[in-house]
């Protein structure tokens, strides 16, 4: 591919700078070319493929979209998909070393496994009014732990976990208390904390924690505890163009400039080792090869402008593929809202 053609589809990565970073697919950028956005062309170019998927993480590729759309998906995944999290903590007794507000904050960050589509938004009361909770907008958990000496512990025991009973309070100690018809509605998939092994507090004999926590719907834009993802990120697909053969010892040196699996060595026509690109997706674009003058005119690095490698790591509240589908629905609703507003402006 000619250099001028690459500038249309790729970002050039040089030793000291990055060039061709601006979008070029709009009318007027190239002389005598019609680059008007076309829906059929967009559908043809749009491609999505899942690389790996399990209960917590998903890696997938999406191409044929602008960076603004890719970033919109990332931001929606982080901040705009509704989930349940603890919002109200009513402390009955807390004689631990952790202050009430710190304990409440730690409990608030514990992820809850509950389908948010089964709940309504909680209506916060006006100043001076009392909150009204229902079984359709609130989930109630209780925690009651008291630390005592273990009567069966050895006299020379030093391990607090054996010396005491309930020396540590875990997220799994939060017990769901069904309200109204919740037990019936969630009979097949009871509400629970995602990870029961999160340490919430440590106790010593005589110390006690007794509280009730209420969870409601929210979004990460309001507080990070509502965010359904631990990470949601993307990077552009790297490109490595070998302009002229790299052989012999140079090929071995060239291979070492990249992470394992990016460059492979094969036997060339003359029997010498020759470098070839094996898997660009493993490249971190460190530009190490550009530090060596012998490769300056033999390789060109870049990134495909509209090809994104997405990585989504769920907190366990929902599967990552479900989260991405929900992000599409949120973006669609935003577009419909803008469309409706524009129609109202035009009608006025």
Swiss-Prot record:
GO cellular component: cytosol; nucleolus; nucleus; RNA polymerase I complex; RNA polymerase III complex
Keyword presence, Transferase: yes
Record keywords, A-Z: DNA-directed RNA polymerase, Nucleotidyltransferase, Nucleus, Transcription, Transferase
InterPro entries: DNA-dir_RNA_pol_30-40kDasu_CS, DNA-dir_RNA_pol_insert, DNA-dir_RNA_pol_RpoA/D/Rpb3, RBP11-like, RNAP_Rpo3/Rpb3/RPAC1, RNAPI/III_AC40, RNApol_insert_sf, Rpo3/RPB3_RNA_Pol_subunit
CDD domains, per database record: RNAP_I_II_AC40
Subunit structure as annotated in this protein's UniProt entry: Component of the RNA polymerase I (Pol I) and RNA polymerase III (Pol III) complexes consisting of at least 13 and 17 subunits, respectively. Interacts with RPAC19/RPAC2.
Function comment: DNA-dependent RNA polymerase catalyzes the transcription of DNA into RNA using the four ribonucleoside triphosphates as substrates. Common component of RNA polymerases I and III which synthesize ribosomal RNA precursors and small RNAs, such as 5S rRNA and tRNAs, respectively. RPAC1 is part of the Pol core element with the central large cleft and probably a clamp element that moves to open and close the cleft.
Protein family: Belongs to the archaeal Rpo3/eukaryotic RPB3 RNA polymerase subunit family.
Name of protein: DNA-directed RNA polymerases I and III subunit RPAC1
Organism annotation: Schizosaccharomyces pombe (strain 972 / ATCC 24843)
The encoding gene: rpc40
């Amino acid at each position: 591919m000619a250099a001028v053609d690459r500038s249309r589809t790729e970002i050039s990565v040089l030793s000291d700078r990055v060039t061709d970073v601006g979008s070029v697919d709009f009318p007027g950028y190239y002389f005598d070319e019609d680059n008007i956005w076309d829906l059929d062309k967009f559908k043809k170019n749009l491609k999505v493929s899942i690389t790996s998927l399990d209960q917590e993480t998903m890696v997938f590729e999406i191409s044929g979209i602008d960076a603004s759309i890719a970033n919109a998906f990332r931001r929606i995944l982080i901040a705009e998909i509704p989930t349940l999290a603890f919002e109200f903590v009513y402390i009955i007794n807390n004689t631990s070393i952790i202050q009430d507000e710190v304990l409440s904050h730690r409990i608030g960050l514990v992820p809850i496994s509950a389908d948010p589509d089964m709940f309504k938004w909680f209506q916060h009361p006006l100043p001076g009014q009392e909150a009204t909770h229902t079984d359709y907008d609130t989930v109630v958990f209780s925690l009651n732990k008291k630390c005592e000496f273990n009567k069966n512990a050895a006299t020379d025991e030093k391990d607090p976990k054996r010396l005491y009973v309930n020396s540590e309070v875990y997220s799994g100690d939060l017990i769901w208390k069904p309200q109204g018809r919740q037990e019936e509605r969630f009979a097949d998939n009871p509400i629970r904390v995602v990870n029961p092994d999160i340490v919430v507090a440590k106790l010593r004999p005589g110390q006690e924690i007794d509280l009730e926590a209420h969870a409601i719907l929210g979004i990460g834009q309001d507080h990070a505890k509502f965010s359904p993802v631990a990470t949601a990120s993307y990077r552009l697909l790297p490109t490595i163009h070998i302009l002229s053969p790299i052989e012999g010892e140079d090929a071995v040196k060239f291979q070492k400039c990249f992470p394992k699996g990016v460059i492979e060595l094969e036997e060339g026509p003359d029997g010498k080792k020759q470098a070839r690109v094996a898997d660009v997706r493993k490249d971190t674009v460190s530009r190490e090869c550009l530090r060596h003058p012998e490769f300056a005119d033999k390789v060109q690095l870049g990134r495909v402008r509209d090809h994104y490698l997405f990585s989504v790591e769920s907190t366990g509240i929902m599967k990552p593929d479900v989260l991405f589908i929900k992000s599409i629905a949120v973006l669609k609703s935003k577009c419909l809202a803008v469309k409706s507003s524009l129609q109202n402006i035009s009608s006025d």
